[in-house]
Amino acid sequence: LITTPEQQADFESQADDGWAYYDELDGFVLYKNKNYVPMGFTYDYYVTEETYGQVNKNSRANLLMRALVFSDEDAAVYGKYLAELPNEKQSELTYDAYVQDCANRRAQACSMFQMNNAGFHAEITLENANLVFFSVPYDDGFTAYVNGEQTDIVRVDDGMMAVLCPAGTSSIDFVYQADGLALSRTGTLAALPVWLVYTAYFVWRKRKKSKV
């Protein structure tokens, strides 16, 4: 996260323990998120969009680190690969639990993620078949391939993407082409780093508001 020296004191007074001072560069103060999770990971649990909508808005960011959000239709198809989140785990959304959920996601993350001119490439090794989640906005211009074979892209988490991968090591490729609109593709790919920073800031702002 990047802030200015003038805002540094305010940030440090409001931020949780997950943020640590990192460096200063060109008049900006840099902070490292110790709860960072790499791109591309799996979950053990899922919830439906209806259940997600019933959770307090200030806790939803925490829930998204614990469970994948399915539509009812996708839950019927892909729910067999995960367990539905028990009721008691839907309310245990404390900061300490969030830290543990981040650690769990890191332990189930891709061993490789790389952007390229066509989209992005990732690799992951799974003990069992599961959905691999990417915090990239869903777009009809994406086509996904798992081990060289085209596969369905599942719209999850209110607009992000996931693909089903088998047990073992899988090679995942997302290729973007929106009706030949190269500029659109470039803009979407260039936005990925910005999206990651925004997501981290969004979580921090949510926590800040909840403390007021």
Regions found by a protein language model. Give the residues of each.
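Active-site-proximal, structured, solvent-exposed surfaces of multi-pass membrane proteins
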Residues: 83-212
